[in-house]
Amino acid sequence: MYKLMKNIQTTALNRTTLMFPLALVLFEFAVYIGNDLIQPAMLAITEDFGVSATWAPSSMSFYLLGGASVAWLLGPLSDRLGRKKVLLSGVLFFALCCFLILLTRQIEHFLTLRFLQGIGLSVISAVGYAAIQENFAERDAIKVMALMANISLLAPLLGPVLGAFLIDYVSWHWGFVAIALLALLSWVGLKKQMPSHKVSVTKQPFSYLFDDFKKVFSNRQFLGLTLALPLVGMPLMLWIALSPIILVDELKLTSVQYGLAQFPVFLGLIVGNIVLIKIIDRLALGKTVLIGLPIMLTGTLILILGVVWQAYLIPCLLIGMTLICFGEGISFSVLYRFALMSSEVSKGTVAAAVSMLLMTSFFAMIELVRYLYTQFHLWAFVLSAFAFIALWFTQPRLALKREMQERVAQDLH
């Protein structure tokens, strides 16, 4: 586990080596804004297709399901063929799907293309992130991931505002055109800047793939650390999926007011990532998680207070979500690193396993809470957010403490 990280060859973080992560984050931005730009427009899209607004969250959940569907293949495939080939092919496929969705005329066809576009999430998480972790030393990799998160977070900051513009002034179709062009620009940067070396993996029959996944999923430490990721990320994912319905459909905010309401929420995430970059070298790795999760729990309690005292609902929603996002910002990159390095299996396979658990959990929980929301409205959202963060304080917290203790013991030797 921890000792394995000392055997991985890495490159120093400098202006030259930073160009690859910057090219990758351009694609990450395209993939994320593929959700954050489109999700606010989903009320208009469902109206165009003549279906209920309750279909709106399904655009995001099918996007995430697409991300989970091929992670099992992309990670191991990149172990064999090299990260660069698989990543470049994935970028082109994503751009093609963005163009094809322009031809859809029914919500079912639209969701099918959203599912296929979601494969871009796996390209990022199972291939791109694995390449970052392998190319940089541990703390540098976490800094790069946090820096990438800050740049990609322009997507949820700009997405709602641009989505409001699409709804009010032009067709939603143009959003997909812009996303496709952005992905193609990223492809050019990755082709030029991404290191082309591949990890040395013994060529084995593809049946070994299932043995590798069995090793990964039978690792209790891996499961404990990885299951923390959807728990920590779920409140924000639910907010992104449901906030158009909460703020616009239920609370009657305008599309512009909806866009502006997202700024403090995602600013909290950006500030959290900046704080992580600043303090990570001063603290034991994992300490920021132990700080961040109580902050997130406090945020969920404020959400509940807002539903109890309706006069303060909108301020409580925004303050609570801002605290949740700040806590996630100082926690998530560290948790991801711990999960990825908790197994001896090749990193492409481990990254794929992480991606599958993460995306499948997101899909299932968003669809479940979407249904609960039709029955219980805001209570479904706020109590779900509280439950997910509270669950982290069970087995995932113990797994984190064990990992931190193991690292201390390794450093002493």
Swiss-Prot record:
Source organism (scientific name): Acinetobacter baumannii (strain ATCC 19606 / DSM 30007 / JCM 6841 / CCUG 19606 / CIP 70.34 / NBRC 109757 / NCIMB 12457 / NCTC 12156 / 81)
A cellular component annotation (GO) from this entry: plasma membrane
UniProt xrefs under PANTHER family: BLL2771 PROTEIN (PTHR43271:SF2)
Family, per entry: Belongs to the major facilitator superfamily.
Listed GO MF terms: transmembrane transporter activity
Biological process, per Gene Ontology: response to antibiotic
Highest rank taxon of the organism: Bacteria
Gene name per UniProt: craA
Keywords in alphabetical order: Antibiotic resistance, Cell inner membrane, Cell membrane, Membrane, Transmembrane, Transmembrane helix, Transport
Keyword Cell wall biogenesis/degradation: no
Listed SUPFAM superfamilies: MFS general substrate transporter
Cellular localization per UniProt: Cell inner membrane
Record function comment: Efflux pump that mediates resistance to chloramphenicol.
Membrane association type: Multi-pass membrane protein
Phenotype on disruption: Mutant shows a strong decrease in chloramphenicol resistance. Mutation does not affect susceptibility to quinolones, tetracyclines, aminoglycosides and imipenem.
Membrane spanning stretches: 18-38, 55-75, 84-104, 110-130, 147-167, 170-190, 228-248, 260-280, 289-309, 312-332, 349-369, 373-393
InterPro entries: MFS, MFS_dom, MFS_trans_sf, Sugar_transporter_CS
Name under which the protein is recorded: Chloramphenicol resistance protein CraA
